[in-house]
Every structure is written in structure tokens, then in C-alpha cells.
Amino acid sequence: YIRQSLTHNSENNQLRNQLYDITKTPDEIEEIDIKDKYKVIKERRNSKLKSDYGVVTLIDQYVVNILPEGGRKSKVVLVYEIIDENGIEQMKEYQLNTYSLTLQKSEIVKADGSIVPAEEGSGTLVFSNLAIGDVIYIEYESYSNSTGRFYKDFNLDCYFNSTYPTVEAVFAIINPENVNYSTKLFNG
């Protein structure tokens, strides 16, 4: 009955979590997510990439799980390295509308491995005392659920043209077997 209820009320995340707990359904995003991001940061920092903006993207990951009952869950991981003074200016304030998101990480990983949390306020993450060699780590999840005639339809776009040079960009879709896609590629 819970699954049937979700079919008619897909925005009820509490009910979905209850169903997944009862049926022991794993979080599919967590199954493919990078497990130890701090290890990856340590391995990738000091990349040889150059940037006029003073920032290199070490990880740009966007994973979306199309839920069988309708709607979707998304997870974003962004990891930036500051490589010169321009990067400090670029990244000291990061605009992110956290209203509809669950912010999981927003921190600076210093060169010595210490972690400094960002300050949050009105759609802005503030990274104080940035220095060259610091890495900014941002991670958040969001749900996009609705009801009505088009509740199973969605438009999703992802870009691979970041302002900053990127070491790794990941765009992944997890979907039920019966999902059909209509795709368009522009300027590709």
C-alpha cells in the first residue's frame, strides 16, 4: 500500500524513506558515489591544469536517480582547488540557493588536511581565510517531486563546459528499466 500511495503522492519523501527502510532498499546514489572524497582530494590536488581564474575543478559530479514512483533524487559533489590569488577572489563567496537543498558538506580542506566549515547565509556560502592550495568541498542532495498530469515527466540538462578546467566531470542517471528518454544535444 505504501508504494501505491507513493504513485499518487510522489512528493512524500517521508513515506518513501519508510518504504525503503521496510524493504531494505539501498540508496542507489550512494552505491555509485565516490566513497572517500578526502582521499580523492589528496590524490588530485596540485594538478597540472592551468586557469586564468585561479580555480581548478577536481570533481564535478551530478548523479540523478529517477524514482519508480515518480520524481527524482539528485546528488551533486563539487570540489575546487585554489591555485592562485584570482581563485581566492573567485571562491571566497559561493552562490548556492540552499532553500530546496540538503547541504551535506561545505568546507575548506586545507593543505595540511585540516577542515574549516563554510559560513552559510541567504544563498551564499562564505569561505573565510582562503589560501592558495586550499580545496573547497561542496556536497548536496535535492528531491524534485510533484503531482498532477505530468508528475513523471522531467526536463534535465547538464553541462560540461565549466568556467574552470576540470579533472573529472561525472553525469550519471539511475533509472527504472521501463524509462524511455527523449534527448537533444546542442552545440555538441
Enumerate the predicted regions with their spans.
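Beta-strand-rich, non-transmembrane domain signature
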Residues: 3-188
